[in-house]
Curated annotation (Swiss-Prot):
Protein name (database record): Ribosomal RNA small subunit methyltransferase A
Gene Ontology MF terms in the entry: 16S rRNA (adenine(1518)-N(6)/adenine(1519)-N(6))-dimethyltransferase activity; RNA binding
Cited Pfam families: RrnaAD (PF00398)
GO-annotated cellular components: cytosol
Catalytic activity annotation: adenosine(1518)/adenosine(1519) in 16S rRNA + 4 S-adenosyl-L-methionine = N(6)-dimethyladenosine(1518)/N(6)-dimethyladenosine(1519) in 16S rRNA + 4 S-adenosyl-L-homocysteine + 4 H(+)
Free-text function comment from the UniProt entry: Specifically dimethylates two adjacent adenosines (A1518 and A1519) in the loop of a conserved hairpin near the 3'-end of 16S rRNA in the 30S particle. May play a critical role in biogenesis of 30S subunits.
Organism: Streptococcus thermophilus (strain ATCC BAA-491 / LMD-9)
Tagged with keyword RNA-binding: yes
Location in the cell: Cytoplasm
Alphabetical UniProt keywords: Cytoplasm, Methyltransferase, RNA-binding, rRNA processing, S-adenosyl-L-methionine, Transferase
Binding-site residues for S-adenosyl-L-methionine, renumbered to this chain: 27, 29, 54, 75, 100, 125
Amino acid sequence: MRIADYSVTKAVLERHGFTFKKSFGQNFLTDTNILQKIVNTAEINKNVNVIEIGPGIGALTEFLAENASEVMAFEIDERLVPILEDTLRDHDNVKVINEDVLKADLQTRVKEFENPDLPIKVVANLPYYITTPILMHLIESKIPFSEFVVMMQKEVADRISAEPNTKAYGSLSIAVQYYMTTKVAFAVPRTVFVPAPNVDSAILKMTRRKQPLVEVKDEDFFFRVSKASFLHRRKTLWNNLTSHFGKSEEVKNKLDQALENAAIKPSIRGEALSISDFARLSDALREAGL
């Protein structure tokens, strides 16, 4: 019997008198086939360390522990710590940390692995309400995570992996794809969770690039420009950029010059620009003194 078997999950929750907290976005997976698929997608083996976020009662953790060298699981809900100690008592390669991963000192934590030189993969069933902040926090951290295999709301997975000229493409697609290659591995129906969420989920696989997808002179400015370009999706690039940088004649002249230098039409919409277009645009805007 597995922790993720519905009857086991139910028994564990009842034994510990656990009640779900909406504020933590808790939905526990009760499908062993999907858990095995997650481990297969992440290609977990004994030469890999894993960081898991939001282990819940340990359904995914159990599969990870059987396959990985070590698992470090961050759980924000202190009520789940004794439950995890119970459900994972047979696995001595799991360390449960009762901490908000957004506040954790990950640089120090990863040194606590017994073999800290092994590649680190992030495998997680992320709370939907905080998926993007956690993801960006991990991607932008200096920890050399080689890969992320993450369960998230399907709509967010589609946005992250979207291509230009699609409805889902936006600043989030650019922010993640700048650092990572992305692929939606498979969809997960809402019916396999307790309690069932209001949305369908997907597993997104992200692999860190050896270097960012494009070269830019100022990363922060590049992300600022891409965000500004999607401020109002139906508006032109020109309208969004003037909303962001200002509408004075001086600013308009600089914008004109920058767009011309970047060979980008002001009448285009942000969603039509590729990531390399945004790199060219942000460098040109920076050179123009904006």
